[in-house]
Every structure is written in structure tokens, then in C-alpha cells.
């Protein structure tokens, strides 16, 4: 079966694991807020004030909310924000794209994600978006350690604390799924709501903790010459370990 046809059981993280998350949030709230501000400034500068933020589900959801809130904080603009499913090997949610394009001009749509690791989803997006004339395949991200986009808050490999958690920092929704026996031809891709995890939900806590660190002025990265892209590292790891499928290689700690 394709991974998009299955959903894992999601558990409440252990107290020890949650301590790691809270420590990460304490140490990285300010750098993440700074990067969100830098990203929002670049979005306004490059895309104007009429853009529509479209988060890639699900890691992009809290990031899109932070960018939306920063733009409201600094520029006083309440930009629309949506989330859309994109599944490696299955593509972007075509019905959701049609819905968006009935409401907005193609040039207004801007995709948002948390970070770019090796660029697999970016490549999927570029392939799919060519079918929608006028829609840009650019992704706005907080962190781009892969060095593939300038539309980012930082190229530093900062730890975005929301990456430590699953549904409990993303509004209690699962990653998206696509199964023919559940999802009809005219339906959006599916997701499950984990209501049983309500008592462990930290979605608003994460957003509000970062939001408290927002500044009107943000500190840009020192310009650094990009020597290589993250995908080059992944390919080299694959060669060294005899792994042909780069989807089996996950950049991380």
C-alpha cells in the first residue's frame, strides 16, 4: 500500500519527550519568531499585500498561522489562510486547487511550509503546479537549510519546535490521506481529527509563545555563499550506504 492510504496511531508523548519540546520552545521561540518576521517581510516585498497563504498540510499549518499573524501584527493586513494536502507520489489536492482558483487569482496563491530538508515536496509541487497556469511553485518557508529558496526566514538549520510534535501542535489533525474507498472523485483529500488527544493539544500554546517574541524589526542572516544544496548531501549518503531510494534517507538530528 502507498503510505497515503494508511494513518499511524498517534499517542500522547511521554513526559520526558515533552520536556525536550518545552526546552526547545524556550530556547528557539525568539529565533523562530525572528525568522517568521523575516519571511513575512520578504513575502510582502515579493508578493505584495493581496496574497493568499496556502499551508502545506500538516507541518505548514502552524507556520502559515504565524506568518498570517505577523503580517497582521506589522502591516495591519488580515490575509486569507488555507491549508492544502500534497502527497509525495500522489500529488496536490486537485479539488482543493480548483476551489482556491474559483475564489482567487492564480498569482495570489503562495504556498507555505515549515522548512525544506532535501526538497522532495518542493519537487512534487513544481511538477504538479505546472497544470495550474499562473500559480507559482514557490514555497515560503521559515528555515531552508537545503539552500534551495530565497523566500525563507533563514538558511540556518534552526530547530522549529513544532517539528517535535505531530497532531498535538497542528490542531489535532492527522497527516492527509487518499483512499478510493473513502475519498470520492469530487472530495478534498482526507484527514482524521484526533479528538481523544484534546487534553494534550498545544497548538495555540505554540503559536502564542512564538507570537510573544514578534518584533517590528528582524535581524537578517549574514549573507553566506551557498556551496551545496541539501539534496547533494542526501545523494552522497545514498551512495555511501548503497541506498537508491532517497525517500528512505531523512535529514534530521
Q: Which residues make up each language-model segment?
A:
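Long, low-complexity, Lys/Arg-enriched
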Residues: 1-51, 72, 76-253
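Long, mid-chain structured domain cores
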Residues: 60, 69-73
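Active-site signature of alpha/beta-hydrolase-fold catalytic machinery across serine-
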Residues: 66
